[in-house]
Amino acid sequence: MSQLLVCRMKPYIQPFERTLALAELSALAHSDPVSVDQHTSNPVLFSIPPVVKPAALARHLAYWETIEADKLYFTTQVLRERTVNVVRNGVPTKDIQQLLFADEIGLPNRRCLRYGTHGIHEYRGKFFPQLVRSLINIADVPKRGIVADPMCGSGTTCVEAILGDYQTLGLDMNPLSVMMARAKCSLLAVSPDALASAYEAIRGQLLRPAGRRSAKLIYFESLPARDREYLSEWFSVQVLQDLD
């Protein structure tokens, strides 16, 4: 493997992300990337010496789409991001796994933040997942190393660490944050078949015609008095019945 590797940067990223993109590529390749398309104001093609296997680069890079070597390698990151397009198209769950690897599913043309379990819960001020991945690359975290986040919020850093095959530790004082972070991380270990089965079961229940609503709030009444008082201030009795 003597030819230069040509890496294509995502063309739609922001200036600060371009800086991170070049920094992560430099850290992983152990050399400074050289612009191939210097005639443009915002070049997206950069070459590096073949000191690292293109497949390894493709597994780690956050802000890049492809690596051209003996063949064209798509980065794992961009393949994960394009899964959002499949789900949004309303494809049946039984067909999703096949379509994820189909050529007709295009690459994203804008920033995608909700792939994997990242879209489960919105958290104000959350990290961009790609930012986390690029910083892990720049920090040169060793294989199976520990990535810790002392204020993990909804778990973006922890999820990216797991996706990158690192160990992770997240801390937060907010119980809701802890619950969401655990849910996001735990789901990554669930088999696709089990997840699809659970989804279809829940979907079936939600789409089932509503029966006669019970006036008794069984789950609501099992909550502590403080929680019942709080929920009653926010929701009407009808909504509480629907939630119950």
Language model: regions and residue ranges:
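Class I S-adenosyl-L-methionine
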Residues: 5-8, 27-141
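Hydrophobic (often cysteine-bearing) scaffold residues that line and stabilize catalytic clefts
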Residues: 17, 21, 124, 128, ...
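Class I S-adenosyl-L-methionine-dependent methyltransferase module
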Residues: 163, 167-170, 174-244
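Short, surface-exposed ligand-recognition loops at beta-strand->loop->(often short) alpha-helix junctions
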Residues: 8-20
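Short alpha-helix
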Residues: 20-28
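Conserved class I S-adenosyl-L-methionine
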Residues: 143-153
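Glycine-rich SAM-binding Motif I of class I
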Residues: 155-159
